[in-house]
A protein has these predicted regions:
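N-terminal binding-site loop/beta-alpha segment at the start of enzyme catalytic domains
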Residues: 1-71, 132, 136-139
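Active-site beta-loop-alpha junctions enriched in small/polar residues
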Residues: 23-25, 48-50, 76-80, 108-111, ...
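Active-site mouth loops of central-metabolism enzymes
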Residues: 16-28, 76-85, 119-125
Length: 155
């Protein structure tokens, strides 16, 4: 059963506590999954470019009977992107794949590219800051939130 409970971020934005994750759902099937989830009350969805299903997620949202403003959409910046221009292009490309006007939350999926995790000591601090700096140039209609995900202290 869907919960409409939210968490309040420091900036006042409310994020749904439960989002339907779309990892491992192929692009053709995810459209139907999104529509069925909306029909039972889900209003928040999580995807990523690496999942290969952003287009289907967008179609599922676009073809539903629910207003876009009532849906909370999260996607992720590919782990290999660690620069200002790459971030801009990734957001524009994601919007094209979704065929939607904005993304509610963009997560920086990992501080390191996947192939480097736990192997290379470069933590990409400058690159991640470049991802973050790009947010100040976003128009509000493109993206509400830019958040770091899977950042941890190495022990």
């Amino acid at each position: 059963m869907y919960s409409d409970k939210t968490l309040m971020l420091n900036n006042g934005v409310e994020v749904p506590r439960i989002q339907l994750g779309t990892w491992l759902i192929n692009n053709d099937d995810v459209r139907k999954v999104i529509r069925q989830a909306i029909n039972v009350g889900y209003r928040a969805f999580d995807t990523a470019k690496d999942y290969g299903n952003e287009s289907g997620v967008g179609k599922g949202i676009w073809n539903s009977d629910v207003e876009r403003s009532d849906i909370f959409l999260t996607t992720k910046l590919p782990t290999s992107i660690k620069d200002y221009e790459g971030t801009k292009k990734a957001i524009d490309d994601a919007l094209d794949r979704f065929n939607l006007e904005y993304i509610d939350m963009l997560l920086i999926h990992s501080p390191q590219p996947w192939i480097e995790v736990n192997r290379i000591n470069d933590r990409h601090f400058e690159g991640n800051l470049e991802n973050w700096r790009w947010k100040k140039h976003l128009k509000p209609v493109k993206l509400d939130q830019l958040v770091f995900q899977i950042f941890y202290k190495k022990t």
